[in-house]
Amino acid sequence: ATNQHFDLLAYLCDNFGGDIHISLGMTTRSEEAAVVRFFERRGRASDLVLYACTSGYPVAFDDVCLLEIERLKRAYGNIVKTIGFSGHHLGIAIDAAAQTLGASWIERHYTLDRTWKGTDHAASLEPDGIRRLVRNADAVARSLTYKPQELLDVEIPQRSKLKWGTRVEN
């Protein structure tokens, strides 16, 4: 909500040496371009992490708009440090898809009880949800690879049993 508060962003640029993470929820494309230009002028664009985000609590799946991750990567991927995803949806399935689309960071709200009063508790994850999200994110990260060889070791015994034309007759 403060990504247009340029005095605050200037203070961060001048006084904080780490990565600066900015959500683009509730932000127009001209406003997001202004944020990136601001960080470029200050020599800090390479420390900027932009988050694709739809701000709502909770956000319907139809409004998550995951392909914004790809759009941001095309528009700013060579300028900023990386692109992330900030989710305010129910569940954790969307986060795995965001990771598959190239989101380097996943940001979710955390609560001890989703029934508590407040704007974002309903869209937040409870402790078990966070554990499942981390488990799934790890599985997705490990599986996003190419085969290092034509046949993996796990496939060789299956191939000799199941693939037509590869059985050795006695």
Describe each PLM feature range.
Residues 1-170:
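Catalytic cores and adjacent flexible loops of soluble metabolic enzymes
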